[in-house]
Design a protein with these regions (language model features):
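Aromatic- and acidic-residue-enriched carbohydrate-binding clefts of CAZyme catalytic domains
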Residues: 1-11, 24
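Alpha-helical scaffold elements lining the catalytic groove of polysaccharide deacetylases
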Residues: 11-18
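Amphipathic coiled-coil/heptad-repeat helices and related helical stalk/stem segments
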Residues: 19, 146-147
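Short loop/turn motifs at secondary-structure junctions
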Residues: 30-31, 159
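Conserved short secondary-structure transition element at the edge of the structured enzyme core
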Residues: 152-170
């Protein structure tokens, strides 16, 4: 129900074929090396399997597939990277709701349980969604020191860290999403 994106009909084989063709076009003609797929949890897994298999079949090309989602089935479908929403939620609870910091180790272990080899989880303290709908890391994590501590934790716990626009310089204002 987003107003800025089309809701595609994944029941349509013609739409699926065109979407995969478009993805292949970008890989071949624009020489991109991967895709970040928004709201990947909401797209049927069999579509992702077909699309990623097609992209991985391009000769002499290694694609990076990044799913904005946290279903581990996305990794089985061929994505190498998913969002660590569980960890991020617990991290905010540690800073704002007095959750024991040891819970971060528990959620981290759970996140990595059963993951296929050569797959990773993205760790962050801010991204475009959080900045648009929630607040800045400085506000969420109780100041600049808290935001830096939270970021260190995202590095320490493993995964792939995300540095969002302005975070590296302590940006304290929300960036316009649109």
């Amino acid at each position: 129900n987003w107003q800025d994106v089309a809701e595609l009909n994944y029941s349509s084989s013609a739409m699926r074929k065109e979407m995969i063709s478009s993805m292949k076009y970008w890989a071949l003609e624009a020489n991109i090396d991967g895709f970040r797929c928004d709201y990947a949890d909401g797209v049927p897994m069999d579509f992702w399997e077909q699309a990623i298999d097609t992209l991985n079949a391009i000769p002499d090309r290694k694609m990076i597939m990044f799913a904005e989602g946290n279903k581990k089935e996305l990794l089985s479908a061929g994505f190498q990277l998913i969002f660590g929403w569980n960890f991020y939620s617990k991290l905010k609870e540690v800073f704002n709701n007095n959750l024991a910091a040891s819970e971060l180790q528990t959620v981290n272990a759970g996140d990595y349980t059963g993951m296929p080899s050569n797959t990773h989880i993205l760790r962050w303290i801010s991204n475009h969604d959080d900045d648009a709908w929630d607040d800045t890391p400085i506000a969420i994590f109780q100041g600049i020191d808290g935001s830096l501590a939270a970021f260190v934790l995202t590095f320490y716990m493993g995964g792939v860290p995300l540095v969002y626009n302005g975070q590296e310089v302590g940006c304290s204002i929300k960036l316009s999403f649109f």
